[in-house]
Design a protein with these regions (language model features):
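Short, low-complexity disordered leader/linker segments with a strong preference
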Residues: 1-48
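Ligand-binding clefts/hinges and TM-proximal coupling segments of bilobed small-molecule sensing domains
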Residues: 32-35, 159-178, 257-287, 326-329
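Short, glycine-/small- and polar/acidic-enriched structural segments
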Residues: 41-179, 185-188, 204-208, 222-223, ...
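Soluble non-cytosolic domains of exported or imported proteins
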Residues: 58, 85-89, 104, 159, ...
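Pocket-lining segment of extracytoplasmic ligand-binding domains
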Residues: 108, 185, 192-278
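Secondary-structure end/capping motifs
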Residues: 245-320
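Conserved C-terminal helix/tail region of periplasmic/extracytoplasmic solute-binding proteins
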Residues: 314-335
Length: 335
């Protein structure tokens, strides 16, 4: 445990260094975006509008990668530059600075950005959990295999405070009548480090996303709770208000292409496995067997989910601004 806590503290000391790296990243990204825009010039010599859209190498973003590879964005008449980030923090900074006009992510970030006077709205839900597919779980390390959930919660769960991870942990524990006040959060913001600490018994338990949940199970960890069924883990497509207002046709075309890609994934799961493995960073041991996610029809984010996350943010005093559903969700753009 002491080794695990030392590793977590070392990670916290890296924060200032990470901020410097993000500043460098934004400088590089600015050059990259400009170069890509010039490539989109039409035959008349005038630059075609480009939607710079931020995403992460995760399973829920698969339709974005499929739409790009299958040419669906082009078919819909929209030029899209998918800007890939390795962390949500990098993506959020890029959105805040205007380097990207839209992004893929959880329900929480748009609310935090909007509360900090960066006008962003969610236009569609691209993925949600069902009874047959999970996306997040709390797992116990092999050394805690004989301990009960209450004991493990108090011993400590590796995760990240004030993030969607903590929200999911709180809601999953509440489903077992365990109040969030009992949770001993061990701060480990890096997901790969969290996985490593779990598998090396440096922490009693950890919160992880798929496909790392399945990988951890293969290596001896035990799933205590997961989000299959409750529909807690919606991921959304969000845009800056300025872009929504000035380029509504581009947003609709983008969402139409994503909807087409989602349907293609559902009809042809074997055909997209190679794209998933490559773009969503599926670990090698799982590349032939991990189930291809099933994607729902694009819908507006469910008001119950949006408001539950918002209330949690208010309770935690992460968001201190009062907002309505209409200030967080943009209607009228779905295909």
């Amino acid at each position: 445990m002491e080794n695990g806590l030392r590793a977590a503290r070392r990670e916290m000391k890296m924060k200032k260094f990470c901020l410097v790296l993000i500043a460098i990243l934004l400088s590089v990204l600015s050059c990259a975006v400009k170069g890509h825009t010039s490539d989109a010039e039409g035959k008349n010599g005038r630059s075609a509008p480009v939607l710079h859209f931020g995403t992460l190498p995760v399973l829920q973003a698969l339709p974005l990668f499929v739409a790009a590879e299958k040419g669906y964005f082009k078919t819909q008449g929209v030029t899209v530059d998918l800007v890939l980030f390795n962390s949500a923090m990098e993506k959020d900074v890029a959105l805040s600075s205007g380097q990207i006009s839209g992004y893929f992510g959880d329900l929480m970030t748009p609310m935090i950005l909007a509360a900090n006077k960066i006008p962003v709205k969610m236009a569609a839900t691209i993925y949600n959990t069902t009874a047959r597919q999970r996306m997040f779980a709390i797992l116990a390390a092999s050394k805690t295999a004989n301990k009960g959930l209450d004991e493990i919660v108090q011993a400590g769960i590796a995760g990240s405070s004030n993030t969607i991870i903590e929200y999911l942990m709180a809601r999953l524990l509440a489903s077992k009548n365990i109040p969030a006040s009992k949770l001993n959060m061990i701060e480990v913001k890096s997901i790969p480090i969290r996985l490593q600490m779990l598998l090396s018994d440096q922490v009693p338990a950890a919160g992880l996303p798929e496909p790392l949940v399945t990988l951890a199970e293969m290596k001896g960890a035990r799933v205590l709770l997961d989000d299959a069924g409750p529909g807690l883990s919606a991921t959304v497509l969000a845009f800056r208000n300025e872009f929504l207002n000035s380029r509504p046709a581009t947003v609709r075309a983008f969402l139409a292409a994503v909807a087409k890609a989602s349907a293609y994934v559902n009809r042809n799961p074997d055909d997209v496995r190679s794209i998933m493995n490559r773009e969503c960073k599926v670990p090698e041991p799982l590349q032939q067997t991990f189930p291809i996610p099933v994607f729902p029809k694009l819908t507006l984010p469910a008001s119950s989910q949006v408001m539950d996350v918002y209330r949690w943010l208010r309770e935690k005093r992460i968001v201190k601004t009062e907002m309505t559903l209409q200030q967080m969700v943009a209607d009228g753009y779905l295909p």
